[in-house]
């Protein structure tokens, strides 16, 4: 009996000693190393810093068990190659705007940006509670991708120009950097539209390769240096009223994760979505003050005639995209029905209150 007890104690001591020589996380479970590719330049505001923060959050919430290495554009794949890289398993996840892939998968436009479409809050409501997420999953499933919303900057600006634009005629021959469905709207107005990656916009403007460019809003645009290369800053960004950025995850990887890890990533993405919008609003307030203080810069609205023309062509473009295939039609119908309902509610709530506040504080 004493011999058996002694042997058991020796065995337990050996096990404890071995465990003590390992880092704490390794005792519990192995570290899972993942790769994230993005469509943004290193340290670019606001997109890349949000992607980096999301990766850190997932690592922290998992107690280091999920370790994500982030590769900005061109470090592993190009800015517009992230979707295909994750689909093929070259990378585990991407951080990008799905409007970059709308020519490949038309329905994806509705989960990113639609001219004169939903704002950030409205889009989040449709995705979370209006059937949008289920449709998004259906759209991405054939490409082996699980999509989640992880960023939104809110209503964007209309862009920087090297001259005033007062009529549709001013867009004819204009070389303009713009992605997504808005690009097709301007193309129909006679503009020469290019989808230049964000990191190349300044060079293109300085060299004269383009005459105008939209990026995001005051905070991001100042960080990029757009205020140093153009004088006319137009609003509103009719083309991107609330562009959502996607965390696209390889579905084979996703399906192999424990339910707790799927929930962890979903919660982290949702938290970053909320934080990114709050951060962008706060930083845009400060950046707009800087721009207003620069007398060289003219902050101007697109006039009513231009807005009407943008709207007319946007309706054409969205209708044509919706007719591309049955699934895109299904997505478009859901999107437009939700938009109609939330616009009705918004007139009584958000718009109604803001109009009242303007009157009260004027």
Residue ranges and their predicted role:
Residues 128-132:
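An N-terminal domain-start capping segment
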């Amino acid at each position: 009996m004493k011999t058996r007890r002694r042997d058991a104690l020796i065995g337990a001591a050996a096990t404890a000693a071995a465990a003590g020589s390992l880092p704490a996380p390794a005792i519990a479970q192995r570290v899972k190393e993942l790769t994230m590719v993005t469509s943004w330049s290193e340290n670019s505001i606001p997109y890349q810093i949000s992607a980096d923060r999301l990766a850190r959050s997932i690592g922290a919430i998992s107690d280091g068990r999920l370790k994500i290495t982030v590769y900005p554009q061109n470090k592993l794949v190009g800015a517009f190659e992230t979707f295909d890289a994750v689909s093929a398993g070259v990378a585990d996840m991407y951080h990008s705007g799905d409007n970059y892939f709308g020519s490949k998968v038309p329905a994806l436009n509705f989960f990113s940006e639609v001219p004169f479409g939903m704002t950030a809050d409205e889009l989040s409501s449709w995705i979370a509670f209006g059937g949008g997420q289920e449709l998004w999953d259906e759209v991405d499933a054939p490409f082996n991708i699980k999509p989640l919303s992880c960023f939104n900057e809110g209503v964007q600006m209309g862009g920087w120009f090297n001259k005033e634009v007062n009529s549709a005629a001013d867009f004819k021959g204009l070389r303009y950097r713009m992605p997504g469905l808005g690009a097709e709207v301007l193309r129909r107005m006679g503009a020469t539209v290019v989808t230049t990656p964000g990191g190349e916009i300044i060079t293109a403007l300085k060299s004269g390769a383009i005459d105008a460019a939209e990026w995001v809003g005051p905070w991001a645009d100042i960080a990029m240096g757009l205020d140093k290369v153009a004088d006319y800053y137009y609003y509103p960004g009719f083309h991107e009223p609330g562009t959502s950025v996607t965390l696209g995850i390889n579905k084979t990887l996703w399906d192999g994760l424990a339910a707790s890890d799927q929930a962890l990533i979903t919660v982290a993405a949702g938290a970053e979505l909320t934080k990114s919008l709050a951060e962008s609003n706060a930083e845009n307030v400060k950046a707009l003050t800087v721009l207003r203080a620069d007398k060289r810069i003219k902050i101007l609205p697109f006039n009513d005639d231009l807005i009407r023309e943008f709207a007319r062509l946007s309706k054409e473009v969205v209708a044509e995209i919706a007719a591309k295939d049955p699934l895109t039609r299904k997505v478009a119908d859901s999107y437009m029905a939700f938009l109609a309902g939330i616009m009705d509610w918004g007139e009584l709530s958000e718009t109604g209150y803001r109009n009242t506040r303007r009157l009260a504080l004027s």
